[in-house]
Amino acid sequence: MTKFWILILILVMATGCDTDQQEKENFPILTGKYLGQKDPGLTPEIFAPNIVSTGMTEINTCFSPDYSEFFYSIILPNRKFVIVSMKYENNRWNKPEVAEFSGQYSDADPFITKDGKWLYFVSKRPEDTTKTERRDWDIWRIGKVDGRWQNPEKLKNGINSESDDIYPTISEKGTLYFSSGRDGTNNRDIYYSESSGDEFNDPIKMNDTINGYWEGDIFISPKEDYMIFRSYGRKEGNGLFITFNNNDHWSTPKRMGNEINMTGNEFCPMVSPDGSYFFFTSSNIVMESENSELLTYKKIKEDFISSYEHPQMGKNDIYWVDSKIIDGYRENK
C-alpha cells in the first residue's frame, strides 16, 4: 500500500512538472528592460497586452532599479488583492507568478526604493498571524539581503493609523509620501514623512493647496520637483492631477489631459526607474463597431465570458506613455 501511494505521488509530481514546463514553453520570449514591448510615444498604450494587461483587473506598476524584477497587482473577483511578480532570469522574463511574500492576505501598491534595498507595499495582513485579515490597509516593507526578499515588517512611528494608509512612494532623499483617511472626514489626504535612518518621523499632512478633496495614489518624483496623484470631487473632474514644486511651494494641481484621463477613473501613477516612461491604470473601454446582429442569450453569455480574456474591457488595465508628456505640463505650470 505504501508503494502504491509513493507511485501516485511521483505521478502527480511528474504531471505538475510537465504542466509547468509546458506553460514555460508556451510563454513568449520577452527580453529587454520593458518586457520586450515596443516603446510608446506621447499617446498612452496598453502595457504588455495579454501578458500583464489581460481580461483580469490589473493595477500598479513597479520595476526594480536594475530591471531584474517587475511587480504589479491583481484585484480578484472577491475584492482580494494580490501582488504578482515577473523575474528576469537567463536573459528572458519569466511568466507572472504570485510574489513570494503575497497571496495569503490582501496586498497591493508595490514600490521599490532607488537603491533596490526596500520594497514598500500595503496590506491587510495582521501582525499576529493567528488573527484574521484586517479591515483597513497598512503600509509594510520588505528588505532585500543577498538578492533575496526577507520577512515583511509593518511601518511604525505613527505612519499607520486605524484608517486606510495606502500607496507609499519615496523620494531620492528618502521622504515617504502616502495617502490616509485618518482625519475621519471620509476623504483621503496626502501626508509625507522624512526619513530618520531606516525609520520615519511622524507624518505631516500637506496643506490645502494639495489636499481638501479626495487625494490618493501618489507618485513623488525622485527630486520631489513634481507629484502626480489621483483626486475626486474637484471642479475640473476626477482622475490624475499633477503639481510642481517651486522652491518648496507646490503649484495648484492641474488635471492631466484627456489623453491620460480617458475615463476619469485613472489611478496608480508611476514613472519608471530610468525616468523614461509614465505608467498608470485605467478602466478605459475600447468599443467595437456597432452592428445590427440580433442578440441571443447564448451570444450575450459568450461575449461576457470573452471579456475576461482581453484587455480594455473596463476591468482596469495598465497603460504606459513617454514621460516627455510630463514636461508638457511643466512648461504650462
Locations of regions flagged by a protein language model:
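Sec-dependent signal peptide recognition
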Residues: T2-I8
